[in-house]
A protein has these predicted regions:
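Short glycine-aspartate micro-motif
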Residues: 55-61, 69, 125-133, 215-216, ...
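Glycine/Thr-rich phosphate-binding loops that ligate phosphate moieties of nucleotide
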Residues: 2-84, 88-91, 101, 129-172, ...
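Gly/Ser/Thr-rich active-site cleft segment
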Residues: 62-64, 178-307, 364-366, 372-376, ...
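Phosphate/pyrophosphate-binding loops at sites that engage ATP/ADP/AMP, CoA/4′-phosphopantetheine
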Residues: 109-129, 202-208, 260-271, 454-467
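Short glycine/proline- and acidic residue-enriched helix-loop micro-motifs
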Residues: 96, 175-186, 359-361, 537
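Short beta-strand-to-turn element immediately C-terminal to the catalytic PLP-Schiff-base lysine
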Residues: 72-73, 142-144, 199-200, 224-228, ...
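Conserved phosphate-binding catalytic cores of ATP/NTP-utilizing and phosphoryl-transfer enzymes
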Residues: 38-53, 286-321, 334
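N-terminal phosphate-binding loop and adjacent alpha-helix
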Residues: 82-124
Length: 567
């Protein structure tokens, strides 16, 4: 449905009065959504086809640089949306923060504006079945449970202030045993080390911890807590889903509960801190309801970390399916099924999604790249190569290749599969011939090379070569970048026409919990039309030569961060 399409009206009996015989195509009232019959609005045709036209699901998409709210129809098509960018704070080298109340206010403003557009199309709020939340992962928020006020800025996922702390923790004998429990290697990336740094270095956080009033959460927990009314309601909603909890290093990957051994390793006393309760990603009750504003009374029924949400939005429900999201960073998830696979080749093991009920949680191998779209922003904002980030592809396309330039975009060290925390961003191969176009092209290639390295690691861990790669995210809009990805990786790259897959995933999680879709089979045709496939065009020897040169550059970027040489 186009974003400005006019709604269609229909008046018929309520669902309770409808024939539920299968041959009549009426919606059955048994199964996952049966307990939601009492919430159905009156006067809407309830065949499966008409249900999808008239039900809507909202999706909060809270990312690293912006917040958005989208409303999808029952066919998985976005109807309206609103987006707001907010300030990213860099108070010191390697530090990256958000103001927690600004995250919240940006989400609330997006909801108000999108709902205004929704009403302008003639739709009532009652047609919104529920909303889901997807969010930047690992970003750590701490607040006072008695006042609901943040105690410090949110420490964002690529922040590297914890490098010295991580080295100290790695020196402990038990550090090598953590990955088997939680799926993550010890690094600056997960929430655990961010929380520990805050307790050790921020007086207000330490005092709240000692007094038992420190609340911790990732961005999903913070938003759910606040949208439900925060500390002002009798029983504050303080929860997280298992995809977000799996990024903290506090959750056991198999039990999906907090693990005493993991908490003890980081010195976290669960009796002195309020940790969010871990719940499934799709549930009609656990996440509460929006307390105020244009969505007051609407259920929050889904929650997924952004990369898990993108996998769901791409329809990656079968083992062997994979997606790569090219956003601020770059994140490749590979569905491994209902048993976790602990990587031997530098990847993360994580929860892909957990839809609760009788279904088992599904796991994934993940490769994370710290810099993707942020590399383009660096060329735009810091170096002034172009006026707008969208112009980088044109600049990169002005030259036939990178002219021998290799850009290791290690602004926050290198993540998977390398895990080199002492690397810094480094340009190799510059000559008098080098132009802005060569550096722009090398910036796009850096993401493609790192993706290829992750794909190679996934093939080793799984024993199977990926047949194609589904892609989304802002940088996937660049045909040049996607063709380069196909050439370097040697596999087709599959891009959907509707790129809002991350937001769609959260909508799917909420919709499955509240009857918009009753099973995964109902989603087979969602986001399938208009996909574009980029097939490899470069000869394999040429691609391998470029990738080998990239590997050489990675090795040469090591060792730039040394405490005795740093100011």
């Amino acid at each position: 449905m186009p974003l400005d399409a006019a709604p269609k009206r229909a008046i018929v009996p309520a669902l309770d009065d409808l024939d539920t015989d299968e041959s009549s195509k009426r919606v059955k009232t048994s199964g996952a959504a049966s307990h939601f019959e009492e919430h159905l609005p009156q006067g809407i045709i309830e065949t499966k086809e008409e249900l999808r036209r008239h039900w809507f699901v909202g999706s909060i998409d809270q990312g690293t640089t912006s917040s958005r709210f989208l409303i999808f129809n029952g066919e998985g098509e976005p109807v309206v949306s609103h987006q707001i960018e907010f300030e990213n704070l860099y108070p010191e080298s390697g530090w990256h923060e958000h103001e927690p109340l600004e995250l919240l206010s940006s989400v609330e403003e997006c909801i108000e504006e999108a709902m205004r557009k929704f009403a302008d199309l003639g739709y009532p709020k009652a047609h919104i079945r529920s909303i889901g939340i997807t969010n930047q992962r690992e970003t750590t928020v701490v607040w006072d449970s008695t006042t609901g006020e943040p105690l410090y800025n949110a420490v964002v996922w690529p922040d590297t202030r914890t490098k010295a702390l991580v080295r100290e923790l790695k020196a402990r004998g038990a550090a090598d045993t953590l990955t088997e429990l939680c799926g993550l290697p010890l690094s600056t990336y997960p929430s655990s080390v961010k929380l520990l740094w805050l307790i050790q270095n921020v007086d207000a956080v330490k005092q709240a911890y000692d007094e038992g009033r420190l609340a911790f959460g990732t961005v999903d927990s913070w938003l759910i807590y606040k949208l439900n009314g925060g500390h002002q309601i009798d029983k504050p909603i303080h929860v997280t889903d298992s995809t977000n909890a799996s990024r903290t290093m506090f959750m056991n990957l198999r039990t999906l509960q907090y693990d005493d051994k993991l908490l003890s390793f980081f010195g976290i006393d669960p009796n002195k801190i309020q940790l969010p309760r871990i719940v499934p990603s799709s549930d009609p009750e656990c996440f509460g309801k929006v307390a105020n504003g244009a969505l007051a009374g609407i259920r929050i029924a889904g929650c997924l970390g952004d990369q898990s949400s993108a996998l769901v939005g791409q329809g990656g429900f079968s083992p062997g399916q994979a997606k790569n999201t090219y956003g601020t960073g770059c994140f490749l998830l590979y569905n491994v099924g209902t048993e976790p696979v602990i990587s031997k080749y530098g990847l993360l093991a994580t929860v892909a999604y957990d839809f609760g009920g009788d279904s088992k949680p599904v796991y994934a191998l993940e490769g994370s790249i710290a810099v993707a779209g942020s590399g383009v922003k660096f060329l735009t904002n810091n170096l002034g190569f172009v006026a707008e980030s969208s112009q980088i592809t044109e600049l990169a396309g002005s030259v036939k290749d990178s002219g021998g330039v290799v850009f290791v975009t290690a602004f926050s060290g290198l993540f998977a599969p390398y895990w080199i925390d002492d690397a810094k961003g480094t340009l190799f191969g510059i000559t008098q011939h080098t132009s802005k176009g060569h550096i722009a092209r090398a910036t796009l290639e850096a993401t493609c090379f790192q993706t290829r390295a992750i794909l190679d690691a996934m093939e080793k861990d799984s024993g199977h070569k990926l047949e194609s790669l589904a892609v989304d995210g802002g940088l996937s809009n660049s045909d040049l970048c996607m063709q380069t990805q196909a050439d370097i990786s040697g596999i087709p790259v599959d891009r959907p026409a509707m790129r809002e897959t991350t937001a769609l995933g959260a909508a799917i999680a909420a919709g499955l919990a509240t009857g918009v879709w009753r099973q995964l089979d109902d989603l087979k045709q969602v986001n399938r039309t208009g996909r574009m496939v980029f097939t490899p065009k470069m000869e394999r020897p040429a691609a391998e030569k470029l990738f080998k040169k990239w590997g050489q550059a990675v090795e040469m970027s090591r060792g730039w961060v040394q405490d005795h040489l740093e100011d």
